[in-house]
Amino acid sequence: MTKQVEIFTDGSCLGNPGPGGYGAILRYKQHEKTFSAGYYLTTNNRMELMAAIVALEALTSPCEVTLSTDSQYVRQGITQWIHNWKKRGWKTADRKPVRNVDLWQRLDLAIQSHTIQWEWVKGHAGHPENERCDELARQGANSPTLDDTGYNPD
């Protein structure tokens, strides 16, 4: 039987661009694991993507995943926009390079072996897991230790 996993994610950025962090919670039955990191210079969207990527990459076998995010950018990007981006060679409808393509490609790879239900939750609205992820993300942003090597301030 396929494992049923819940993932909750959030990203934060102080300045946008600026110091940023992500937080994620991975829950399987009664087990829970949290993920968090901070970057010296990044964007909010990159941190939202990283939260989902890191949690999904932690899964070691195919799972049925419910992934909750407060980022419409992540949810719409992975459920709607990515298909055409890939058809166009990672270009937008107006033929410009997709922003954050390094992370979109990594997320695309991370989802391949899983069945994922992408759920949007309103941020800062009292959703307990989203609030915890927000706290983890802000902690990361407030004490960065990593360079976001893929960040391109074009």
Swiss-Prot record:
Cited InterPro entries: RNase_H, RNaseH-like_sf, RNaseH_domain, RNaseH_sf, RNaseHI
RNase H type-1 domain: residues covered: 1-142
Gene Ontology biological process terms from the UniProt entry: DNA replication, removal of RNA primer
EC number: 3.1.26.4
PROSITE patterns found in the cross-reference section: RNASE_H_1
Keyword Nuclease: yes
Binding site for Mg(2+) 1: 10, 48, 70
Cofactor note: Binds 1 Mg(2+) ion per subunit. May bind a second metal ion at a regulatory site, or after substrate binding.
Annotated signal sequence range: none
Key word Magnesium present: yes
Localization, UniProt: Cytoplasm
GO molecular function, one term: magnesium ion binding
Broad EC category: hydrolase
One Pfam entry name: RNase_H
Keywords: Cytoplasm, Endonuclease, Hydrolase, Magnesium, Metal-binding, Nuclease
Cofactors that this protein relies on: Mg(2+)
Gene label: rnhA
Positions with a binding annotation for Mg(2+) 2: 10, 134
Protein name as annotated: Ribonuclease HI
Organism: Yersinia pestis
Family listed: Belongs to the RNase H family.
Catalytic activity: Endonucleolytic cleavage to 5'-phosphomonoester
Chief localization: cytoplasm
SUPFAM superfamilies to which the protein is assigned, alphabetical: Ribonuclease H-like (SSF53098)
Function according to Swiss-Prot or TrEMBL: Endonuclease that specifically degrades the RNA of RNA-DNA hybrids.
GO cellular component, one term: cytoplasm
Assembly: Monomer.
